[in-house]
Regions:
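Acidic/His- and Gly-rich active-site-bordering loop/insert found
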Residues: 1-91, 118
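Acidic/histidine-rich catalytic neighborhood of metal-dependent amide-processing enzymes
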Residues: 94-152
Length: 152
């Protein structure tokens, strides 16, 4: 899992860089195919890529994002591990959470989907209606984004 996190983090994906967001979704799909045995669907929502793995009509949605707030080059080095802490753009928000969810989906065959957008850091401007639409049809939507200081 740590190697997958390193790969996702090193592929910097600031929201405003659409090609980088496409690239990170493609990498997430490669990881999903290897870990889960089947590829994700790469959907387009208002011109932006969205990762969708799992049921087409899920009762439970695990919602994530793979864009980052950091412009490319904000971290030097881009990836760093010191003791038990990993650092880099998107480690905390929210590439690690995405990977935890992806690995947790192993063995789930129906009723759930892992969905990752690429515009969350700018307020989900292009995916907000899509998120509302898919959420309205689900029984539960879980977001595994980390919080500061143990806040919920």
């Amino acid at each position: 899992m740590l190697a997958d996190l390193e790969a996702l983090v090193k592929l910097e994906s600031p929201t405003e860089d659409l090609q980088s967001c496409r690239d990170v979704i493609a990498l997430a799909n490669e990881i999903a195919t290897r870990v889960l045995g089947t590829p994700a669907q790469i959907r387009e929502v208002n011109g932006r890529p969205v990762f969708w793995w799992g049921s087409d009509n899920p009762e439970v949605i695990v919602l994530a994002h793979l864009d980052t707030v950091w412009p490319k080059g904000s971290f030097t080095p881009v990836w760093q591990v010191e003791g038990t802490a990993a650092r880099g753009p998107g480690v905390f928000d929210m590439k690690a959470g995405f990977l935890q969810a992806l690995y947790a989906m192993k063995g789930i065959t129906e009723g759930a989907a892992l969905v990752a957008t690429t515009d969350e850091e700018t307020g989900s401007a292009t995916s907000k209606e899509f998120i509302k639409e898919i959420s309205a049809e689900a029984k539960a939507v879980l977001v595994l984004e980390a919080t500061l200081n143990g806040k919920v």
